[in-house]
Amino acid sequence: KMLDAWLDNYFKTGLPGKAILNRDEDSEYWPRLNTEIHAWINWTWPISDIESFCNAFSHPHSGAKTEINGTDVRIFKIKSFKKKKKFHSFQTGLIFKKSKKNIFIAHGEGYLVLDTDDLYPKSVKPRLGDRFFTSSKKIENSFSTRIQYTPDGKVIKEI
């Protein structure tokens, strides 16, 4: 309705309307992210942060990233469960249980459940005892790299 009203006014008067200035004290700026650089999962984060991070990089994006057995993989959706019996922090990322459809991943605050349909590439077949892991080098690079884009969508990296 707002767009219709604006278009009606524009076509009647030829004027774009009154500009509304942003108040600096109410403004925030967050730089754009690039999935190839910024989507690495930090397994030391709180379990709820890992869940929201993975789900934020889900479709239409190309998934949150981590490694298993030296292979980069992408996770599209994950669900966290906090429980009274917690795992030791050294167990974080370990696959402690599997079913036909789900992979159960240990975390110090509980566990995460990954549907096998949300793990790519499909050629990766995690086994019990395997660990999802992201190297500190990849995590540091994701924090230290700023991405900017040109108007035509090309990436400009800043470090």
Where are these regions (language model features)?
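Active-site-proximal loop/hinge segments within enzyme catalytic domains
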Residues: 1-81, 151-159
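C-terminal active-site/capping subdomain that shapes the small-molecule cofactor and substrate pocket
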Residues: 51-159
